[in-house]
């Protein structure tokens, strides 16, 4: 289709989660609450780990990095969504849309690989405790984290670069609550075959590979837990692992539903619901899941509260 026969989209309207006016206030209050919990929880976790010397270990180094990613991941999307709920205008400019897509993709990809790094760290700690300090040295942790962000930036740059090559002119309504890949591809007047192929290939690498790493790590971890003779110790370990596995399953399951299938397979409304989980729910839950059953975190909180009171 010749781009010269069409006017390009310079400003778009985000369809949002619901078009019903009576739901906008309720959705605003719901997501405002989620946003506050997410920001407080993740920034609180980063601050707590930074201030507590006994938490300066590889496990908490990765947890701090995950909290930073979750904070950024959420704030790229939620503030704009809240403004749209409040004003009911839902307008986003083309540069703002591309910037949101680029930043969102960085942190979404980075989160996949950070969760895999954390699972590997847990595997080494439980299955090879004598070699833990050698394998998970500060040097290795640093470069693992750098690698996570490099993969995020590389994947996001590829997606956004190919998106910028498309001529968006079909409509100015984006059937989503933020600028994501498949909703934007639906606006294109030119062929999206390469873009959709890239989404499937890169999603397979950035979702399936980390998911398989996590699965393998937890298989070995569970096998080690089963060898624990103490019933109390075994149940405690299973309780902790089950909460971690649940958070990971929700994140990767919803992300896979969104990206690991062609755009024609499921409706955009189904994809909207799925994306709520990995863009807002999981970033809110992660600090709670990784801290509620953690004695080290509870001890650090008590110490800081005691120092503040004194």
Curated annotation (Swiss-Prot):
Glycan-bearing residues: 5
Which GO biological process entries does UniProt record here?
G protein-coupled receptor signaling pathway; sensory perception of smell
Q: Which PROSITE patterns match?
A: G_PROTEIN_RECEP_F1_2
Cite the ranges annotated as topological domain Cytoplasmic.
47-54, 121-139, 218-237, 293-310
Disulphide connectivity of cysteines: 97-189
Principal place where this protein is found? Answer: membrane
Gene Ontology MF terms in the entry: G protein-coupled receptor activity; odorant binding; olfactory receptor activity
Question: Which keywords accompany this UniProt record?
Answer: Cell membrane, Disulfide bond, G-protein coupled receptor, Glycoprotein, Membrane, Olfaction, Receptor, Sensory transduction, Transducer, Transmembrane, Transmembrane helix
Membrane topology according to the record:
Multi-pass membrane protein
What Gene Ontology terms describe where this protein resides (cellular component)? Answer: membrane; plasma membrane
One Pfam family name is 7tm_4
Q: Which InterPro entries match?
A: GPCR_Rhodpsn (IPR000276), GPCR_Rhodpsn_7TM (IPR017452), Olfact_rcpt (IPR000725)
Q: Where in the cell is it found?
A: Cell membrane
**Superkingdom:** Eukaryota
* Residue intervals annotated with topology Extracellular: 1-25, 76-99, 161-197, 259-271
Ranges that cross the membrane? 26-46, 55-75, 100-120, 140-160, 198-217, 238-258, 272-292
Q: Of which family is this protein a member? A: Belongs to the G-protein coupled receptor 1 family.
Function, as annotated: Odorant receptor.
Full protein name? Olfactory receptor 8G3
Q: Which organism is it from?
A: Homo sapiens
Q: Which gene encodes it?
A: OR8G3
């Amino acid at each position: 289709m010749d781009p010269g026969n069409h006017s390009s989209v310079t400003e778009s309207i985000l369809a949002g989660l619901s078009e019903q006016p009576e739901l906008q206030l309720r959705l605003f209050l719901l997501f405002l609450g989620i946003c506050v919990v997410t920001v407080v929880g993740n920034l609180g976790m980063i601050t707590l780990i930074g201030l507590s010397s006994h938490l300066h270990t590889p496990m908490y180094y990765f947890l701090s990095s995950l909290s930073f990613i979750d904070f950024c991941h959420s704030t790229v999307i939620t503030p704009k969504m809240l403004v749209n709920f409040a004003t009911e205008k839902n307008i986003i400019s083309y540069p703002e849309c591309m910037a949101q897509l680029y930043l969102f993709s960085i942190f979404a990809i980075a989160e996949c690989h950070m969760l895999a790094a954390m699972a590997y760290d847990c595997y080494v700690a439980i299955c090879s405790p004598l070699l833990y300090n050698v394998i998970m040295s500060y040097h290795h942790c640093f470069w693992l984290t750098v690698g996570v962000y490099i993969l995020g930036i590389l994947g996001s740059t590829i997606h956004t670069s190919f998106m910028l090559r498309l001529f968006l002119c079909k409509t100015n309504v984006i059937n989503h609550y933020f600028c994501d890949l498949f909703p934007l591809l639906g606006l294109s007047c030119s062929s999206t075959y390469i873009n959709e192929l890239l989404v499937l290939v890169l999603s397979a690498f950035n979702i399936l590979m980390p998911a398989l790493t996590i699965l393998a790590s937890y298989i070995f971890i569970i096998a080690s837990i089963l060898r624990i003779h103490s019933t109390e110790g075994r149940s405690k370990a299973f309780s902790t692992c089950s909460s971690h596995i649940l958070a990971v399953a929700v994140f990767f399951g919803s992300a896979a539903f969104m990206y690991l299938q062609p755009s024609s397979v499921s409706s955009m409304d189904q994809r909207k619901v799925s994306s709520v989980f990995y863009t807002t729910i999981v970033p809110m839950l992660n600090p709670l899941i990784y801290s509620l059953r953690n004695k080290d975190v509870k001890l650090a909180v008590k110490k800081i509260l005691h120092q503040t009171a004194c």
